[in-house]
């Protein structure tokens, strides 16, 4: 019996080895679009994952312990790109980072930065990007989705349970999303990777203060392939173990209830409170138009058995345009006469103007008289001759007397 069991195990191992050797080597596909790849762009340190609240999701449960855990959800990046188009910004900058959250700290998993991106294209279509930086043990069985916003975890181990956080930043606007990963109980994948957080040199867990001081990208993360060749590398390892990656993956669901087995020691996140809808203001009630005449109150006729009878209508009074004069008791001061404004005089010649004209006329006459006097004074007899008299004194003496 023991010999038969050993022979069966040898045959099975030989058959598996033949299948593994038959797996062809991966071929690296070309980039989906042209871009320039560099080691760093603007960020030299990994941004902190503790910058604000996060939306919480939990991944789909695995039916196969060696399946693929999909950390996928829509971060609503299209809204930010449409906003950039509306503000006529020609390009935008972005970066994506993944972390594993523990008690008050975070393990680095993945970081990439984009620049000179076209907001009219899908997210990640940029002219410049950095080389994807990975924590080396995670790159062996994790890789980004095709849109580079999700993360796929192939054949996870029990140590992979817990809380993972994604940070997507577009032009300084941060979008945080938490994913809760829980694996089926009592099932283990035989070829799952082992935990290396404690044995690997750079598997430290960084607090918020450490991120604020600066966690260098090039020192604690390792460059790896871009998304298309990275997927082929992980798929090659998966196929060597007799599996094939599925073409589609189910997205995570919002965190409505606790998972069946939350990670031990991980802080339980709280969903972000949704804003309460503001009550709509009620329209003001319409004010009824005042009636022309108020109804007359009813009176009770005791002689008729107490039944209310309406009062007779009041006689109409003629409209008085003005109130009658007030009656002032004797001995009271009489009201003063109302002020009567003066009637303006008819337009005419001003008295001041008449004085000026008269004075000017007199001065003119005086000036003419002075001029005539001087004229005759200077001319002497000549002037006298002009008036019919002698020219000078000698001629006056020569004239015979009467």
Swiss-Prot record:
Entry keyword set = Disulfide bond, Glycoprotein, Host-virus interaction, Membrane, Signal, Transmembrane, Transmembrane helix, Viral attachment to host cell, Viral attachment to host entry receptor, Viral envelope protein, Virion, Virus entry into host cell
Annotated region Profusion: the residues are 238-316
Which GO molecular function entries does the Swiss-Prot or TrEMBL record give?
receptor ligand activity
Q: Residues annotated as region Disordered? A: 252-350
The secretion signal range is 1-17
List localization entries. Answer: Virion membrane
Cellular component aspect of the GO annotation: membrane; viral envelope; virion membrane
**UniProt cross-references to Gene3D superfamilies, sorted A to Z:** 2.70.230.10
* Composition-biased stretches (Basic residues): 269-278
Q: Is Signal set as a keyword in this record?
A: yes
Q: How does it sit in the membrane?
A: Single-pass type I membrane protein
The PTM entry states: Not N-glycosylated.
Q: What name does this protein carry?
A: Envelope glycoprotein D
Biological source species: Suid herpesvirus 1 (strain Rice) (SuHV-1)
Name the lineage: Viruses, Duplodnaviria, Heunggongvirae, Peploviricota, Herviviricetes
